[in-house]
Amino acid sequence: FSDVDELVSSLNKELGEGSIMNFGDDKPIISIPRESTGSLVVDKALGGGWAVGRIHELVGMESCGKTMMCTLSMIEFQKKHPDKLVAIIDVENAFDIEYARKMGLDINRFLISQPSYGELAIDITAKLVESGRVGFIVVDSVANLVPKKEIEGDMEDSNMGLQARLMSKAMRVLTGIVNKSDCVLVFINQYREKI
């Protein structure tokens, strides 16, 4: 496998150290820390829970418990990290804070934002990740991340692809900053039967 090592060495020399890596028998594999979902079954399915420094998408049918799962995850995170905050970007304006408090969410270490359009939701999410104070963020939900142009436009305006472009840009912006952080970011989404 010396040819593999030579290729990696050559590319790293040309493009910068760490540009490409291989994990042969003699190389340590980097372990990604995990945060519990609050469910042993789901933790096992995810290889130990939500991967830290990664973006996740939790998808399911309407009212199947996606927000409840994320609330349980935030509660578990608060138990493990008393010095960190958790947050929800409640685009749906439907988060029941009183119910979450009864479930065990410490509202003194909880932030909520109810942005009026998608770009603002993404900007707030990015700022929370970059702050280093928030370790678990939920965006509820992708389906309601409506671009500002769509909100301000007429019903007849052609807005095809605006949300797809918004999410594409969001992933480009968020992937790098989340990857360099100690934050878990979960986007909630739902299946649609008809378009």
Q: What name fits each language-model region?
A:
Residues 2-113, 122-130:
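The Walker A/P-loop phosphate-binding site
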Residues 35-39, 67, 118, 160, ...:
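A conditional alpha-helix N-cap/helix-loop micro-motif detector
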Residues 84, 133, 183:
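Short coil/turn segments at beta-strand junctions that form active-site/ligand-binding loops
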Residues 124-137, 174:
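Short amphipathic alpha-helices and their capping/turn segments at secondary-structure boundaries
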Residues 136-183, 187-195:
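Conserved P-loop NTPase nucleotide-binding/switch module
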